């Protein structure tokens, strides 16, 4: 996080602190792999236990297959039971009926369930205009030890490149410092063979920054479309237009400049 701060200040770029949604954080740096101490205040340890304490029933190890529809009314959800690992479906079916159904399956899972259910779609918009804030990463080697796998990640940010770009102009982006567990670093670096091994040998000195690109506010940023495969699982078609590519290039350039301003000896996407 300090690399972002130092680089931003040297370039005259504004930055700020992120209010982290935690309680009793041990600063282990495993955030990207799932919090091992339940300090991260996710729905798993906040909303769901609260609901259970107030009479809710949690149906787990099932996959929602389709909504039970009566015209425009949703009567429940038909589900498929999963194996103990929650990976492979079994032959068992589970039907959940309710007075109210709230669909919260994310930007890809939600339209997929609506498509499988053949829900009313008079304007043929289900699954279209899917926006995901495309993300770019720049990894840099610093002369000092960073040990990015220790401590709290994503505690600083910069919205400079959001505030200096009009909403309907070039694609703006937010810059943060992601959690960098060694496994996450190893699968995200654009290298292989000896180059990959050399990079990982320098891991204690590696800083990473990520940019969250603001899509959906320009006529050339039309987003993607969620479709169904032959087996009913979702797939995403997200065309990378020249407009999006320009945002990708600008974000990588901005992060690289901040890293070099902070003393980096090498940076790579």
Predicted regions and their residues:
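Surface-exposed helix-capping loop/turn segments at secondary-structure junctions
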Residues: 11, 119, 257-269
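Glycine-rich loop(s) and the adjacent beta-strand/alpha-helix scaffold that form part
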Residues: 37-38, 53, 62, 66-67, ...
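Non-transmembrane alpha-helical segments in soluble domains
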Residues: 5, 48, 52, 114, ...
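Short, hydrophobic/aromatic-rich segments at coil-to-beta transitions
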Residues: 72-78
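Conserved redox-cofactor binding core of oxidoreductases
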Residues: 1-66, 74, 267-269
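Residue-level marker for well-ordered alpha-helical positions
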Residues: 2, 45-46, 108, 124, ...
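FAD cofactor-binding and catalytic pocket of flavoenzymes
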Residues: 98, 123-259, 266
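Hydrophobic alpha-helical scaffolding
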Residues: 34-41, 103-104, 241-245
């Amino acid at each position: 996080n300090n690399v972002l701060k130092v680089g931003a200040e040297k370039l005259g770029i504004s930055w700020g602190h992120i209010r982290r949604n935690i309680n009793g954080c041990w600063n282990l740096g495993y955030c990207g792999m799932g919090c091992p101490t339940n300090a991260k205040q996710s729905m798993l340890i906040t909303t769901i236990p609260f609901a259970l304490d107030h009479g809710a029933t949690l149906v787990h190890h099932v996959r929602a297959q389709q909504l039970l529809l009566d015209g425009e009314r949703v009567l429940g959800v038909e589900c498929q039971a999963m194996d103990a690992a929650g990976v492979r479906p079994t032959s068992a079916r589970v039907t959940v009926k309710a007075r109210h159904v709230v669909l919260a399956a994310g930007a890809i899972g939600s339209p997929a369930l609506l498509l499988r259910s053949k829900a009313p779609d008079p304007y043929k918009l289900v699954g279209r205009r899917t926006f995901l804030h495309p993300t770019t990463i720049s990894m840099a080697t610093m002369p000092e030890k960073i040990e990015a796998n220790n401590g709290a990640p994503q505690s600083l940010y910069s919205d400079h490149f959001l505030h200096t770009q009009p909403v309907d102009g070039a694609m703006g982006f937010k810059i943060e410092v992601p959690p960098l567990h060694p496994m996450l670093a190893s699968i995200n670096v654009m290298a292989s063979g000896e180059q990959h091994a050399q990079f990982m040998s320098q891991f204690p000195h590696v800083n990473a920054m990520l940019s969250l690109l603001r899509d959906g506010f320009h006529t050339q940023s039309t987003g993607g479309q969620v479709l169904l495969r032959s087996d009913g699982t979702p797939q995403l078609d997200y065309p990378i237009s020249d407009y999006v590519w320009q945002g990708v290039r600008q974000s990588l350039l901005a992060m690289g400049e901040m890293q070099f301003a902070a003393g980096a000896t090498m940076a790579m996407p």
